[in-house]
Amino acid sequence: MHWTTNMDPKIKELELRHNPVIIRVNKFDEDSASDFAAKMAMAHNTGQSIIPVIIDSYGGQVYSLMSMISAIRSSEIPVATIVEGKAMSCGVILFSCGNEGLRFVTSEATLMIHDVSSGAWGKNEEIQASAKETKRRNKKIYEIMADNCKKPKDYFY
């Protein structure tokens, strides 16, 4: 695979203290979010100038996605997001969190976004609370993506 960009030539003359960390994301659950945070922390100790995050995912849990976004936002090293295969649902939101100029999609890849889904059940009040939370999460992820894409807050909804 070959990616091109207008990257600073100094990046090519990089000396690493350890093997670079490359993060692969194929699901969004508590375990993968924890692993993601650990690998982001490891990457800060390698001397690498960019943290590549390769996404090939159908999506998953929004709360786990939010944890991954927090790890990216707190990174002192630029994060490149690369889609191979697919970035659907949570995957496309995470893709948008890569630093500007460091978001890449292979020509064979597919991106797909949709509203947050919920499996609400229970008493009327519980269903209403779940619907309210689903609406809040949906608005939040669309605003994150709009901000990352330099669009108005309500661009995606």
Predicted segments with their positions:
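Terminal-region recognition feature
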Residues: 1-157
